[in-house]
Protein backbone atom coordinates (compact mmCIF):
# COMPACT_ATOMS: atom_id res chain seq x y z
CA UNK A 1 0.00 0.00 0.00
CA UNK A 2 1.30 3.47 -0.88
CA UNK A 3 2.43 5.72 1.97
CA UNK A 4 0.58 8.75 0.57
CA UNK A 5 -2.71 9.37 -1.17
CA UNK A 6 -1.78 9.61 -4.83
CA UNK A 7 -3.20 12.64 -6.66
CA UNK A 8 -5.86 12.33 -9.32
CA UNK A 9 -4.94 12.97 -12.93
CA UNK A 10 -7.18 16.04 -12.72
CA UNK A 11 -9.03 17.89 -9.99
CA UNK A 12 -11.78 15.31 -9.72
CA UNK A 13 -15.50 15.11 -10.34
CA UNK A 14 -16.05 14.71 -6.60
CA UNK A 15 -14.25 16.23 -3.63
CA UNK A 16 -13.67 14.33 -0.40
CA UNK A 17 -13.50 17.00 2.31
CA UNK A 18 -11.64 15.09 4.97
CA UNK A 19 -11.29 16.02 8.62
CA UNK A 20 -7.57 16.56 9.19
CA UNK A 21 -7.58 14.19 12.18
CA UNK A 22 -8.49 11.32 9.84
CA UNK A 23 -6.20 12.16 6.93
CA UNK A 24 -3.45 9.77 8.03
CA UNK A 25 -5.67 6.75 8.71
CA UNK A 26 -4.37 3.83 6.62
CA UNK A 27 -7.88 2.51 5.96
CA UNK A 28 -8.94 5.88 4.55
CA UNK A 29 -5.91 6.09 2.26
CA UNK A 30 -6.52 2.54 1.09
CA UNK A 31 -10.20 3.26 0.40
CA UNK A 32 -9.37 6.38 -1.62
CA UNK A 33 -6.82 4.43 -3.64
CA UNK A 34 -9.29 1.63 -4.36
CA UNK A 35 -12.10 3.87 -5.60
CA UNK A 36 -9.62 5.72 -7.82
CA UNK A 37 -8.41 2.43 -9.24
CA UNK A 38 -12.06 1.61 -9.96
CA UNK A 39 -12.26 4.74 -12.13
CA UNK A 40 -13.66 7.40 -9.81
CA UNK A 41 -12.11 10.85 -10.18
CA UNK A 42 -11.94 11.73 -6.50
CA UNK A 43 -9.95 14.70 -5.22
CA UNK A 44 -9.11 15.06 -1.53
CA UNK A 45 -9.23 18.28 0.46
CA UNK A 46 -8.23 18.30 4.15
CA UNK A 47 -9.55 20.61 6.87
CA UNK A 48 -7.13 22.14 9.35
CA UNK A 49 -9.25 24.45 11.52
CA UNK A 50 -12.80 25.57 12.14
CA UNK A 51 -14.43 27.10 9.07
CA UNK A 52 -12.40 25.09 6.56
CA UNK A 53 -15.37 22.85 5.78
CA UNK A 54 -17.53 25.87 4.93
CA UNK A 55 -14.79 27.36 2.77
CA UNK A 56 -14.11 24.11 0.93
CA UNK A 57 -17.82 23.56 0.24
CA UNK A 58 -17.90 27.02 -1.36
CA UNK A 59 -14.72 26.37 -3.35
CA UNK A 60 -16.13 23.07 -4.60
CA UNK A 61 -19.21 24.87 -5.89
CA UNK A 62 -17.07 27.55 -7.55
CA UNK A 63 -15.03 24.80 -9.23
CA UNK A 64 -18.18 23.21 -10.66
CA UNK A 65 -17.94 20.09 -8.48
CA UNK A 66 -21.24 18.21 -8.50
CA UNK A 67 -20.72 16.19 -5.31
CA UNK A 68 -18.76 16.60 -2.09
CA UNK A 69 -18.18 13.90 0.51
CA UNK A 70 -17.90 14.83 4.18
CA UNK A 71 -15.19 12.63 5.68
CA UNK A 72 -15.40 12.73 9.47
CA UNK A 73 -17.89 12.59 12.32
CA UNK A 74 -21.16 14.40 12.90
CA UNK A 75 -19.36 17.70 13.49
CA UNK A 76 -17.65 17.54 10.10
CA UNK A 77 -20.95 16.71 8.39
CA UNK A 78 -22.65 19.59 10.20
CA UNK A 79 -20.00 22.11 9.15
CA UNK A 80 -20.09 21.05 5.51
CA UNK A 81 -23.90 21.04 5.46
CA UNK A 82 -23.77 24.58 6.85
CA UNK A 83 -21.37 25.55 4.07
CA UNK A 84 -23.56 23.99 1.39
CA UNK A 85 -26.65 25.74 2.71
CA UNK A 86 -24.95 29.12 2.33
CA UNK A 87 -24.81 28.51 -1.43
CA UNK A 88 -27.53 29.21 -3.96
CA UNK A 89 -29.61 26.07 -4.47
CA UNK A 90 -28.74 25.86 -8.16
CA UNK A 91 -25.00 25.78 -7.40
CA UNK A 92 -25.19 23.53 -4.32
CA UNK A 93 -23.29 20.24 -4.75
CA UNK A 94 -24.83 16.98 -3.60
CA UNK A 95 -23.53 15.45 -0.37
CA UNK A 96 -22.08 12.06 0.43
CA UNK A 97 -20.75 10.91 3.79
CA UNK A 98 -17.66 8.92 4.81
CA UNK A 99 -18.24 8.27 8.54
CA UNK A 100 -15.07 8.56 10.63
CA UNK A 101 -14.36 9.52 14.23
CA UNK A 102 -16.19 8.79 17.48
CA UNK A 103 -19.63 10.26 16.80
CA UNK A 104 -21.46 9.14 13.66
CA UNK A 105 -25.09 9.30 14.68
CA UNK A 106 -26.40 10.58 11.36
CA UNK A 107 -24.45 8.01 9.36
CA UNK A 108 -25.61 5.30 11.76
CA UNK A 109 -29.23 6.33 11.37
CA UNK A 110 -28.87 6.30 7.59
CA UNK A 111 -27.43 2.79 7.73
CA UNK A 112 -24.16 3.71 6.02
CA UNK A 113 -21.43 1.05 5.99
CA UNK A 114 -18.76 1.46 8.66
CA UNK A 115 -15.98 0.16 6.40
CA UNK A 116 -14.44 3.19 4.61
CA UNK A 117 -14.24 1.64 1.14
CA UNK A 118 -17.88 0.52 1.18
CA UNK A 119 -18.99 3.88 2.57
CA UNK A 120 -17.07 5.69 -0.16
CA UNK A 121 -18.76 3.55 -2.80
CA UNK A 122 -22.17 4.55 -1.47
CA UNK A 123 -21.12 8.21 -1.36
CA UNK A 124 -19.82 8.10 -4.93
CA UNK A 125 -22.22 5.76 -6.70
CA UNK A 126 -25.65 6.21 -5.11
CA UNK A 127 -28.02 8.57 -6.94
CA UNK A 128 -28.65 11.47 -4.55
CA UNK A 129 -32.13 12.11 -3.17
CA UNK A 130 -33.57 15.38 -1.94
CA UNK A 131 -33.73 15.55 1.84
CA UNK A 132 -34.72 18.16 4.41
CA UNK A 133 -32.33 20.36 6.36
CA UNK A 134 -33.15 21.78 9.78
CA UNK A 135 -32.67 25.39 10.81
CA UNK A 136 -32.42 26.73 14.34
CA UNK A 137 -31.92 30.46 14.40
CA UNK A 138 -29.06 31.12 12.00
CA UNK A 139 -27.66 27.59 12.35
CA UNK A 140 -28.29 24.43 10.35
CA UNK A 141 -28.59 20.78 11.32
CA UNK A 142 -29.25 17.68 9.26
CA UNK A 143 -29.62 15.12 12.03
CA UNK A 144 -30.91 16.23 15.39
CA UNK A 145 -30.93 19.13 17.82
CA UNK A 146 -31.13 18.27 21.51
CA UNK A 147 -31.51 20.59 24.46
CA UNK A 148 -31.43 20.49 28.23
CA UNK A 149 -30.07 17.39 29.92
CA UNK A 150 -28.93 15.64 26.73
CA UNK A 151 -26.95 18.67 25.60
CA UNK A 152 -25.43 19.13 29.05
CA UNK A 153 -24.12 15.56 29.05
CA UNK A 154 -22.56 15.87 25.62
CA UNK A 155 -20.98 19.26 26.33
CA UNK A 156 -19.39 18.06 29.58
CA UNK A 157 -18.01 14.73 28.40
CA UNK A 158 -14.20 15.07 28.11
CA UNK A 159 -13.03 14.42 24.55
CA UNK A 160 -10.58 11.62 25.52
CA UNK A 161 -13.34 9.84 27.44
CA UNK A 162 -15.70 10.22 24.50
CA UNK A 163 -13.12 8.62 22.21
CA UNK A 164 -12.40 5.84 24.70
CA UNK A 165 -15.93 4.84 25.58
CA UNK A 166 -17.87 5.91 22.49
CA UNK A 167 -21.60 5.93 23.23
CA UNK A 168 -21.01 4.58 26.75
CA UNK A 169 -19.51 7.91 27.77
CA UNK A 170 -22.90 9.55 27.47
CA UNK A 171 -24.56 7.03 29.79
CA UNK A 172 -21.72 7.35 32.30
CA UNK A 173 -21.90 11.13 32.47
CA UNK A 174 -25.67 10.88 32.63
CA UNK A 175 -25.58 8.78 35.78
CA UNK A 176 -23.09 11.13 37.40
CA UNK A 177 -25.06 14.31 36.68
CA UNK A 178 -28.72 13.27 36.77
CA UNK A 179 -29.36 13.92 40.45
CA UNK A 180 -27.89 17.45 40.36
CA UNK A 181 -29.72 18.47 37.21
CA UNK A 182 -31.79 21.67 37.28
CA UNK A 183 -34.66 21.82 34.76
CA UNK A 184 -35.01 24.59 32.19
CA UNK A 185 -38.29 26.45 32.38
CA UNK A 186 -39.52 27.60 28.99
CA UNK A 187 -42.46 28.04 26.65
CA UNK A 188 -42.77 25.90 23.53
CA UNK A 189 -45.04 26.88 20.64
CA UNK A 190 -45.94 24.78 17.59
CA UNK A 191 -48.81 24.82 15.06
CA UNK A 192 -51.38 22.98 17.20
CA UNK A 193 -50.54 24.27 20.66
CA UNK A 194 -48.05 25.49 23.23
CA UNK A 195 -46.55 24.21 26.46
CA UNK A 196 -45.07 25.79 29.57
CA UNK A 197 -42.74 23.05 30.78
CA UNK A 198 -39.83 22.39 33.14
CA UNK A 199 -37.65 20.68 30.56
CA UNK A 200 -35.54 17.67 31.34
CA UNK A 201 -34.80 17.05 27.67
CA UNK A 202 -35.88 18.48 24.34
CA UNK A 203 -35.14 16.84 21.00
CA UNK A 204 -35.87 18.13 17.49
CA UNK A 205 -35.26 15.35 15.01
CA UNK A 206 -34.74 15.39 11.29
CA UNK A 207 -32.71 12.20 11.79
CA UNK A 208 -33.39 9.66 14.51
CA UNK A 209 -30.50 9.35 16.97
CA UNK A 210 -27.92 11.32 18.94
CA UNK A 211 -25.49 10.96 21.83
CA UNK A 212 -23.81 7.82 20.55
CA UNK A 213 -26.84 5.88 19.29
CA UNK A 214 -29.65 7.05 21.59
CA UNK A 215 -32.92 6.83 19.64
CA UNK A 216 -34.59 10.15 20.44
CA UNK A 217 -36.73 10.36 17.29
CA UNK A 218 -37.36 6.78 16.12
CA UNK A 219 -40.11 7.71 13.65
CA UNK A 220 -38.00 10.32 11.85
CA UNK A 221 -37.74 10.57 8.07
CA UNK A 222 -35.38 13.04 6.44
CA UNK A 223 -37.66 13.67 3.46
CA UNK A 224 -41.12 14.20 5.02
CA UNK A 225 -40.93 17.92 5.86
CA UNK A 226 -41.62 17.24 9.55
CA UNK A 227 -39.59 17.63 12.72
CA UNK A 228 -39.91 15.00 15.41
CA UNK A 229 -40.53 16.90 18.65
CA UNK A 230 -39.67 15.01 21.84
CA UNK A 231 -40.52 16.81 25.08
CA UNK A 232 -39.40 15.22 28.35
CA UNK A 233 -40.51 16.96 31.54
CA UNK A 234 -38.45 17.14 34.70
CA UNK A 235 -38.94 14.38 37.29
CA UNK A 236 -38.28 14.48 41.03
CA UNK A 237 -38.48 10.88 42.29
CA UNK A 238 -37.58 7.31 41.38
CA UNK A 239 -41.26 6.54 40.86
CA UNK A 240 -41.60 9.41 38.39
CA UNK A 241 -38.39 8.35 36.68
CA UNK A 242 -39.78 4.83 36.20
CA UNK A 243 -42.94 6.27 34.65
CA UNK A 244 -40.83 8.52 32.44
CA UNK A 245 -38.82 5.53 31.22
CA UNK A 246 -42.03 3.60 30.51
CA UNK A 247 -43.36 6.53 28.50
CA UNK A 248 -40.11 6.80 26.56
CA UNK A 249 -40.60 3.18 25.50
CA UNK A 250 -44.04 3.99 24.07
CA UNK A 251 -43.62 7.66 23.04
CA UNK A 252 -47.15 8.87 23.80
CA UNK A 253 -48.50 11.95 22.06
CA UNK A 254 -49.43 13.36 25.46
CA UNK A 255 -47.97 11.56 28.49
CA UNK A 256 -47.40 12.86 31.99
CA UNK A 257 -43.66 13.22 31.37
CA UNK A 258 -43.14 12.51 27.67
CA UNK A 259 -44.72 13.94 24.53
CA UNK A 260 -43.78 12.92 21.00
CA UNK A 261 -45.15 15.04 18.17
CA UNK A 262 -44.46 15.66 14.49
CA UNK A 263 -44.46 19.36 13.60
CA UNK A 264 -43.21 21.57 10.73
CA UNK A 265 -41.76 24.10 13.20
CA UNK A 266 -41.40 24.87 16.89
CA UNK A 267 -40.52 28.01 18.86
CA UNK A 268 -38.90 28.20 22.30
CA UNK A 269 -38.77 31.13 24.71
CA UNK A 270 -37.01 31.29 28.07
CA UNK A 271 -35.39 33.77 30.43
CA UNK A 272 -32.28 31.59 30.56
CA UNK A 273 -30.10 30.22 27.79
CA UNK A 274 -30.86 26.60 26.95
CA UNK A 275 -27.79 24.42 26.24
CA UNK A 276 -28.22 22.82 22.83
CA UNK A 277 -26.43 20.44 20.54
CA UNK A 278 -26.93 20.70 16.78
CA UNK A 279 -25.61 17.49 15.25
CA UNK A 280 -23.40 17.25 18.33
CA UNK A 281 -22.08 20.81 18.09
CA UNK A 282 -22.76 22.83 21.27
CA UNK A 283 -24.49 26.20 21.40
CA UNK A 284 -26.83 28.19 23.67
CA UNK A 285 -30.12 29.93 22.84
CA UNK A 286 -32.66 31.75 25.03
CA UNK A 287 -35.19 32.08 22.21
CA UNK A 288 -35.27 30.28 18.90
CA UNK A 289 -37.42 29.01 16.06
CA UNK A 290 -36.58 25.62 14.58
CA UNK A 291 -37.98 24.48 11.25
CA UNK A 292 -37.16 22.40 8.19
CA UNK A 293 -36.22 23.42 4.67
CA UNK A 294 -37.91 20.61 2.71
CA UNK A 295 -35.81 19.03 -0.04
CA UNK A 296 -33.04 21.60 0.39
CA UNK A 297 -30.12 19.20 -0.07
CA UNK A 298 -29.33 16.26 -2.33
CA UNK A 299 -27.90 13.36 -0.29
CA UNK A 300 -26.34 10.07 -1.36
CA UNK A 301 -28.16 7.82 1.13
CA UNK A 302 -28.08 4.02 0.93
CA UNK A 303 -31.00 2.31 -0.79
CA UNK A 304 -33.50 1.08 1.76
CA UNK A 305 -32.39 3.52 4.46
CA UNK A 306 -34.82 3.65 7.37
CA UNK A 307 -34.61 7.47 7.25
CA UNK A 308 -36.14 7.65 3.77
CA UNK A 309 -39.87 7.60 3.07
CA UNK A 310 -39.38 5.53 -0.12
CA UNK A 311 -42.03 7.50 -1.96
Curated annotation (Swiss-Prot):
Mg(2+) binds at residues 221, 224, 226. It is an enzyme of class 2 (transferase). ATP binds at residues 47, 73-79, 102. Its EC number is 2.7.1.-. It is found in: Cytoplasm. It comes from the Bacteria. Signal peptide: none annotated. Its cofactor is Mg(2+); Ca(2+). InterPro entries: ATP-NAD_kinase_N (IPR017438), Diacylglycerol/lipid_kinase (IPR005218), Diacylglycerol_kinase_cat_dom (IPR001206), Lip_kinase_YegS (IPR022433), Lipid_Phosphate_FormReg (IPR050187), NAD/diacylglycerol_kinase_sf (IPR016064), YegS/DAGK_C (IPR045540). Transmembrane segments: none annotated. Probably phosphorylates lipids; the in vivo substrate is unknown. Belongs to the diacylglycerol/lipid kinase family. YegS lipid kinase subfamily. This is Probable lipid kinase YegS-like. It comes from Chromohalobacter salexigens (strain ATCC BAA-138 / DSM 3043 / CIP 106854 / NCIMB 13768 / 1H11).
Amino acid sequence: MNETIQPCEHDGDTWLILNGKSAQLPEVREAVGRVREAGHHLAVRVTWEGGDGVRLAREASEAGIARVIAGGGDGTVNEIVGGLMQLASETRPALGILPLGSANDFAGGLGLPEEPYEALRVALETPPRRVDVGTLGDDYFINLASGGFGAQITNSTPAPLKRLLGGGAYSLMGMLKAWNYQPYQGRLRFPDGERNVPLFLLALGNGCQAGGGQQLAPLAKIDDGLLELLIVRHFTSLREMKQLIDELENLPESGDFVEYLQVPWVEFESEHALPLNLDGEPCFHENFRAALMPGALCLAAPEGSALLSHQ
